[in-house]
Amino acid sequence: IAIVSSPSGVDDGSFNQDNYNGVLKFIEENPNATVTPIREETGDSAAAVQAVADVVADYDVIVCCGFQFAGIGNLAQENPDTKFILIDSWPTVDGTEVTADQVIDNVYAAYYAEQESGFYAGMAAALSTTTGKVAVVNGIAYPSNVNYQYGFECGVKYVNGTEGMNVEVVELPSYAGTDVTGANVGGNYVGNFSDEATGKVLGNALIAEGVDILFVAAGGSGNGVFTAAKEAEGVKGIGCDVDQYDDGANGDSNIVLTSGLKVMHDTVYNVLNEVKDGSFKGANVT
């Protein structure tokens, strides 16, 4: 098994690590299996696909962590004996995303409803803020991250409407995101999933605007946001993808309010078991 990740690697304490934990659980139960973590250093989509192509002949199963790996569709068709687990996207073939019924036999691809956990994160933030200002910090404006952003905003709006509150979702125009279609989606985007320094700068900028609850969906960059929260007074963070309570430890206290779980490790673990028992089938699931 190979697992190819974004630049933040499989020890990012968030997205990549959750996928990796699914592999590790499978290996614990199947000690003859092995895993090789491969870190794609740039985050560029073409480079991500090339990183997979470079090792495709060496592994039975390749786990691809993130939207930037969507372009593996052609590669998968050219290598039918290799199984692919694609997280956060359906594959593209010749640059076009497949439809639900255009299954590639050796690709199990999974989308998640991030807007749902984002909604609850927004509710939690709106109900917990003392300053009346909250924000969401993302890495790159991939579809999954935009889902988190819009879900969060809707959660805050819902609380405002039902509880008679006026909580503001703060966005800094200089950190607005551009999605995969080229549209400006607003929000607060670090521009990377492995830039803790910029994450801290962005976190501090939001705190300076009065934000006291930060929903952090930025992978390794989010560690910098958490640092900014720890160094401030009365600021809380909401984790993403995994339970990030341990990341919130700050002396005798903890700055993590809650976390929005994605449970990708179960997907990876279950599909690896299907490979093992021969029941694996290509699929595009949500």
Name every feature range the model reports, one short phrase each.
Residues 1-286:
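A residue-level marker of the well-folded mature domains of exported/periplasmic proteins
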